[in-house]
Amino acid sequence: MALSQKEQDIQMMLAAQCHLGTKNCHYQMERYMYRRRQDGIYIINLEKTYEKLQMAARIIVAIENPQDICVLSARPYGQRAVFKFAQYLGCKSMAGRHTPGTFTNQIQKAFEEPRLLILTDPRTDHQPVKESSYMNIPTIAFCDTDSPLTHVDVAIPANNKGKHSIGVLYFLLARMVLEMRDQINVTNPWSVPVDLFFYREPEEAKEAGEEETFEAEGYALPAPVGAAENWGEAAAPAPEAAGYDGAAAAGGFEAAAGFEAAAPPVAGYVAPEAFGGAF
């Protein structure tokens, strides 16, 4: 028997471990828990997660202009998912560190005034959550078992720390929004794979044989004087400087170094012997 769309989505969330929480549980998140394992890990009820995803999709569809929706993620695992979500829905994305005052300081160059805020983790993105409360901006957030729900209007219970779980959650939310907008349906399905929403590791270092080579000019050491192509041949001696007399130079140096050849003492000079020979 073929599974319904809801059952398929829940199976996908199970495979991505969206149901695994942490060993701590916030008292406001207890309503979304299914049970607690023997090792202390809380299990999230994915039925309620699916219901909250549909609720969040209805809120997103209610915004006429998608540019009034802002999606944020300070976690590295959610940054690629945020970019893809914004690409397919036409909303704004902010990945990485949130600049304080983006929603409150109108003098700031990067000032934004969204009508809806979507967050990956309310604990990591605590600064935009706080600013949204000042500006009365509705907030949707993916909340883990230990996430605080202060100033969060719609909490979607799920694992927001895994790279696969975050990608699946944003994928399902984007697909639900497109279905409600009637941009995709049974006859015109969404052909985007969920893998595009997953975090990807940085490219590995190149192999030793593929190291970059630089031009010799400007980077190589200068050739030694008199160096020959054949290393077995001796280099020609350097020519002596014309008119150079090493003995005279040495003699002049010795004469100048003597105490007798030094300049006479300045007037008013008192010899050390006048003080007993020592200070």
From Swiss-Prot:
Record's GO cellular component terms: cytosolic small ribosomal subunit
* Predominant cellular place of this UniProt entry's protein: cytoplasm
- List the CDD domains hit by this protein, alphabetically: RPS2
User: Span of the secretion signal?
Assistant: none
Q: Which residues form a coiled coil?
A: none
- List UniProt keywords, sorted A-Z: Cytoplasm, Ribonucleoprotein, Ribosomal protein
* GO BP term (any one): translation
> GO molecular function: any one?
structural constituent of ribosome
Compartments (UniProt record): Cytoplasm
Under the heading Gene3D superfamilies, the entry gives: Glucose-6-phosphate isomerase like protein, domain 1
Quaternary form?
Component of the small ribosomal subunit. Mature ribosomes consist of a small (40S) and a large (60S) subunit. The 40S subunit contains about 33 different proteins and 1 molecule of RNA (18S). The 60S subunit contains about 49 different proteins and 3 molecules of RNA (25S, 5.8S and 5S). Interacts with ribosomal protein S21.
What HAMAP family does UniProt report for this protein, alphabetically? Ribosomal_S2_euk
- Family to which this protein belongs: Belongs to the universal ribosomal protein uS2 family.
* Record function comment: Required for the assembly and/or stability of the 40S ribosomal subunit. Required for the processing of the 20S rRNA-precursor to mature 18S rRNA in a late step of the maturation of 40S ribosomal subunits.
PANTHER family referenced in this protein's UniProt entry, alphabetically: 40S RIBOSOMAL PROTEIN SA (PTHR11489)
Checking NCBIfam families in the record gives:
uS2_euk_arch (TIGR01012)
Its name, as the record gives it, is: Small ribosomal subunit protein uS2
